[in-house]
Amino acid sequence: MDVKRVKQILSSSNRIDVTYEGVPVWIESCDEQSGVAQVYDVSNPGESVHVNVTALEEK
């Protein structure tokens, strides 16, 4: 995935399924400069991680 698509997903009112290393995640935010997104595991929303947007996959 790229930063442009992450931004589109963030601004969308639709639910768009995204995974990180095969795990379903919600995208919380994206830093366009660094290409890093803050994501939460759908099954464990209490913990977030920062990942490179290229590691995210749209399902």
Swiss-Prot record:
Source taxon at top rank: Bacteria
Entry keywords, A to Z: Sporulation
InterPro entries cross-referenced by the UniProt entry: SASP_SspH
Expression induction: Expressed only in the forespore compartment of sporulating cells.
Signal peptide (residue range): none
Transmembrane segments: none
Annotated compartments: Spore core
Family in the record: Belongs to the SspH family.
Descriptive protein name: Small, acid-soluble spore protein H
Organism: Bacillus cereus (strain ZK / E33L)
Taxonomic lineage: Bacteria, Bacillati, Bacillota, Bacilli, Bacillales
Encoding gene (name): sspH
